[in-house]
Amino acid sequence: MSYADQNIFLFMGGFFIAMAMQRWNLHKRIALYIVKFLGTSPRRIVLGFMVATAFLSMWISNTATTMMMFPIGLAVIFHAASMLDKEKSGINTAPGSFNFGLVLMLGIAYSASIGGIATLVGTPPNIVFAGIAKSMFPKAPEIGFLDWLKIGLPLVIIFLPVTWFYLTHIAVPPGISKIPGGREVIERDLRKLGKMGTGEKLTLFVFVFVALSWVFRRDIDLGFWVIPGWSGLLGISDYVHDSTVAIFGAILLFLLPVNFKKRVFVLNWEWALRIPWGIILLFGGGFALAAGFQTSGLAQWIGERLSFLCGVPTIIMILCICLLLTFLTEVTSNTATTTMMMPVLGALAVATCIHPFLLMIPAAMSASCAFMLPVATPPNAIVFGSGYLKIPDMARVGFFLNIIGAIIVTLLVYFLVIPIFGINALALPF
């Protein structure tokens, strides 16, 4: 049953939607419009790229997002360097010495990792947490798309501007006040895309339909008013989950015709095959591992060995977990690390009588906050290949951002998770 977990189908449906966006270049159009809207001064260009990258990373893989934003960013850097050289500004625009190139590349990589935290389908560690938490603690509150969005989106809204300010004002100031003709580069790429085609429009329709269906599937309590969920109104709330919506959206992509005469549909199997099937198999293995922890008694055994931590303040324990996961994923896969650590953290929660969400959620979030090394994440490796940054630069900037991220995640989880999920911090969901 571990390989048929609903969270696997949720992520699979999200992958299919992401493939459709990439096939018809919808993601590129969205990114270019965001960058164009946010302005053309060096700092605002960095902000535009970071917002666009983070938004796309909420829905498609951070690797695909970075691969798409990377050449656009390089085009802006090359244009800026060319114009500054023509004006004989005296600024060294060579790769490795051009601060604007360094900060833009770092901004793209870091925002790709941060953006994925916002949604349940944004990055694998989020889904790993949801699946293992459900397996180990079936009586705990359900973690659906909207539930995660309530904590993931606030984190991104706080962390992204903090990262932008840290990069552009403290760590790597661009060193230039304006980029002559910077807007033209973005407008040129938009002109190349042409008018929005049928494939893009249909993909956008399915994307919006699925996102809204996720958000409004269950009742939303605003305090003064309860918005009824569509699944309850239709009387099917016991049979419909977020994964149902995701797979239904994926089926629509295979059925909606772009050109019926030529048998061209929004998504075909050639593109569907490109989703990362290895990640899906890894999910199943992780959920099976968590079930093994429970049924074999290993979780209880680990919990008994960790009982000496009972006296440690909860907030200190959360911070230590955040720092551990952040720096551990600098040299290991965040998906594999999260899969390995979640059952252990579940056992730790039982041993210390702390609600497991307070330990497992920050671990999942922190697994996406490795900013120091090129090997830490695919986005880091991609931008490192530009030549505009060196390992010491990334390590110096990323070290302090790792610390900042751990602190932000700790505070947000400590003060938001309890009221949002309505849990008792010192009670186990048994």
Where would I find each of the regions flagged by the language model?
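Flexible hinge motifs at transmembrane-helix junctions and intramembrane kinks/re-entrant loops
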Residues: 1, 63, 165-173, 194-202, ...
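Alpha-helical transmembrane segments
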Residues: 5-15, 58-73, 112, 148-165, ...
